[in-house]
């Protein structure tokens, strides 16, 4: 995210070069860590940048990137769908050896 205070985008971008796969895409979302990642597409709050060139400096990548309105989620969903298998039903939690302790989301999330 452009103004991310946890994972600076230029550092994240340089990390992509160290990934072995040639099938990789860097997408930069607008805003900060939470707002740029967590906001769902329905909020239509922030855009994102893409650039197929991967051998550039972070500044050059940004300068020549295309800006897109709306969430980066649909782009990620399309990428992930191409790499995923078919949808399967979720398993039923619990077993004789490991019974369910409480229904989701669990009691620990309500603890203070």
PLM regions with names:
Residues 1-112:
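C-terminal subdomain of alpha/beta-hydrolase-fold enzymes, centered on the catalytic histidine
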């Amino acid at each position: 995210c452009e103004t991310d205070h946890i994972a600076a985008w230029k550092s994240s971008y340089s990390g992509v070069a160290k990934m072995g796969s040639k099938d990789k895409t860097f997408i930069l979302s607008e805003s900060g860590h939470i707002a740029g990642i967590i906001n769902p597409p329905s909020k239509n709050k922030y855009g994102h940048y893409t650039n197929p060139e991967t051998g550039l400096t972070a500044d050059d990548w940004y300068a020549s990137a295309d800006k897109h309105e709306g969430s980066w989620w649909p782009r990620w969903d399309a990428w992930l769908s191409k790499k995923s298998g078919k949808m399967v039903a979720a398993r039923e939690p619990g077993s004789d050896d490991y019974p369910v302790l409480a229904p989701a989301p669990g009691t620990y999330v309500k603890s203070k």
